[in-house]
A protein has these predicted regions:
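Membrane-embedded transmembrane alpha-helical bundles that form the catalytic cores
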Residues: 2-657
């Protein structure tokens, strides 16, 4: 009997050790059964902790008493730390360090700001110093772990050195504990560091601006920073949106519960059925060896990847929104059907909305926004010039980039009427370049961000032009590309792709001009709804195609060893562009039957994506209103279908390593 009890105790001990053990090969992902077992236990504990915290029936008290709030938020803070430890190991210490640092610095910022206001001053130098210290610490941590190899590559390229990156933090840790516990020859990127550093920067900045009061309790602030559903891949939550929720009572209606379940199922479907299946069965094969596939297959893989990255990232966000809602917290919308966008500018109002707003609030506007340029603008122009030098390996290109920037500023100074537009475009371009670099430490990400910036600027000019002017300008571009195509060069494939794209736009503009002339000769506009719908469809197709080709640089720069990311990413991108622009010997009709499931799934996914938003809201509400037994049956059927698509090896979320 004693032996049996000992065996049981040993099993319990091993089980508990396994729960709190970190396995780098098995992080807690939303698509793993282990996570849902983890969440079931967490939600059970949360229900016990928050069960007595419901709003009373009269609704008189919406806020929690202090000790109950601390109990609930402290519980979720500790659970979030456990989740991050299971996902990223001892990097949980880094998360705690950032939390403690910004908690105390924000309190200091608020204290000195209030003293300045009481003395009749608008600003406090000490508060500004603490803000700069907070931003320096947060960005310093981010740059060390994410951009060390990138910066080392720049230094080596410019000065011809052979500087090697070593893990200083690991070396220091080994020295403290007195033994070689951590590897010092490689810097590992902590999961989600790009998200939570930006989140705490926005918090201290908003405290400095007086937009929010600092959180008084470290457990409340820690919960805000580390809330596990959105910790590793966003959305980036503004303090003013989330902190007030920390003090509210837990309340979850029957309809809200149904909506939460719908978001979770919707996210799992996007991730497993759409994203992972397309990646494993087609996209990854082509991107791994683009030279083995035809131009059509490379092009199809590029369009499929454009949908995959949306399904992957928005799928994570949907699950995060659903999990948060079940616990009574609301996360902001991060995607609004981005491939319905009719131009690049509108796309970025629909895609990764939380990041777009962060960049606008904390980068674009401080640079001067649409009014002026600042010292920061000139600083980043110099940085971009250096980046151009690294990309091309030629001083001539760097000089050209700098000359263009100077010519743009001189033009703005000599043309007061256009000055604000020019400054706005400069600041917008810098914002997009840095937004691209936020996604990854590779020049390809900067190219991706720069292309999006160019697309936004071109649209601003395009929207001001008459149809005839659009035709004339596009005709010039087509002629130039045609002449470049006749000149044999390594960029022949690029000229071919651009020529096809611009020729499509030109033909479309000519048809539109003829249609407008035809209707101008009549007393009424014929088929106005058809004309409007056609124009919308055309704009969506052009925008989707443009965004898809920028993804070439996004995909080729992802999931690479930081030490060789620049060279590898560039080789993948150029190889795919070469195949797309020149290799069309294989008949597309012979390719489609071989991958018919992939093409069918892509078409179904895009069709669902393009469903009008009012219809999506309607079927979400209908699902939420289903009787509970019927909802359980629908969920069971959906889960059964979803896990028919599960691959042997689960695919990590694309944004998991940002």
């Amino acid at each position: 009997m004693t032996i049996e009890i000992q065996d049981i105790l040993i099993l319990i001990k091993e089980y508990l050790l396994n729960i709190f053990a970190f396995d780098p090969n098995s992080p807690l992902l939303f698509t793993h059964f282990r996570f849902w077992a983890f969440f079931a236990v967490v939600f059970t504990g949360f229900s016990i902790v928050a069960g007595s915290l419901h709003k009373n029936r009269s609704g008189a008290r919406l806020h929690l008493p202090g000790w109950r709030r601390v109990l609930r938020n402290g519980y979720l803070f500790l659970i979030s730390l456990l989740f991050y430890y299971k996902t990223s190991g001892l990097f949980v210490g880094l998360l705690i360090l950032v939390t403690l640092t910004d908690f105390f610095l924000a309190r200091g910022i608020y204290r000195f700001r209030q003293k300045a206001i009481n003395k009749g001053h608008e600003k406090s130098k000490m508060a500004l110093f603490l803000l700069c210290l907070s931003v320096t610490i947060d960005l310093g941590i981010l740059c060390y772990f994410k951009y060390s190899y990138f910066f080392a590559d720049i230094v080596n390229q410019i000065f011809g050195t052979n500087f090697q990156v070593t893990n200083i933090a690991a070396r220091l840790g080994n020295h403290i504990i007195g033994r070689p516990f951590w590897s010092v020859d490689r810097i590992v990127l902590p999961v989600g560091i790009s998200f939570y550093t930006f989140q705490v920067i926005s918090y201290t900045a908003d405290v400095y601006k007086g937009l929010v009061r600092p959180v008084r309790n470290i457990l409340d602030f820690g919960f805000y920073v580390s809330f596990f559903p959105q910790l590793v891949a966003g959305p980036i939550i503004k303090a003013s949106d989330f902190i007030p929720q920390l003090y509210r009572r837990y309340a979850l209606s029957r309809t809200q519960f149904g909506i939460a379940v719908f978001w979770i199922l919707n996210g799992l479907t996007k991730k497993i059925v759409m994203s992972d299946y397309l990646a494993v069965n087609f996209i990854d094969r082509v991107f791994a060896n683009p030279q083995l596939f035809s131009g059509f297959e490379n092009l199809a893989a590029l369009f499929a990847y454009s949908f995959q990255v949306y399904a992957d990232f928005s799928g994570y966000t949907d699950i995060a929104i659903g999990l948060s809602l079940m616990m009574g917290f609301y996360l902001p919308q991060n995607f609004n059907s981005p491939y319905k966008a009719q131009n690049a500018r509108n796309f970025w109002k629909r895609w990764h909305i939380s990041l777009s707003r962060w960049l606008q609030t904390y980068l674009y506007i401080p640079l001067g926004g649409n009014r002026n340029i600042s010292f920061g603008t000139w600083f980043w122009i110099c940085v971009i010039t250096i980046a151009a030098l690294i990309l091309s390996g030629s001083w001539i290109v760097a000089v050209i980039v700098l000359a263009i920037a100077l010519a743009t500023v001189i033009t703005a100074l000599r043309s007061p009427g256009k000055r604000r537009h020019i400054y706005a475009n400069m600041n917008s371009m810098i914002t997009m370049l840095l937004g691209g670099l936020w996604h990854g430490a590779s020049c390809n990400f900067m190219i991706w961000g720069g292309l999006n910036g160019v697309g936004m600027i071109i649209f601003k000019f395009w929207s001001d032009w008459h149809t005839v002017k659009r035709i004339i300008v596009t005709s010039y571009v087509v002629c130039i590309l045609f002449l470049l195509r006749l000149w044999a060069s390594p960029a022949l494939a690029l000229w071919n792709v651009l020529l096809c794209f611009c020729a499509f736009i030109l033909v479309s503009m000519i048809i539109k001009c003829i249609w407008q002339y035809y209707n101008s000769q009549r007393d009424y506009v014929r088929w106005p709804r058809f004309a409007k719908a056609t124009n919308v469809v055309w704009s969506v197709i052009v925008t989707f195609t443009f965004i898809t080709f920028t993804r070439l640089f996004f995909r080729s720069g992802s999931n690479l060893d930081p030490a060789v990311a620049n060279e590898t990413a560039w080789n993948i991108a150029t190889s795919m562009m070469t195949r797309i622009g020149t290799e069309w010997t294989v008949n597309p009709l012979d390719v489609i039957p071989a991958y018919w499931k992939v093409f069918l799934l892509f078409c179904i996914g895009m069709a669902i994506h393009w469903i009008p938003e009012r219809m999506k809201r309607r079927y979400r509400y209908l699902f939420a209103k289903l009787p509970l037994p019927l909802m359980v049956l629908v969920c069971a059927f959906a889960i059964f279908i979803i896990y028919q698509f599960v691959t042997a090896e689960m695919q990590p979320f694309i944004y998991f390593q940002l």
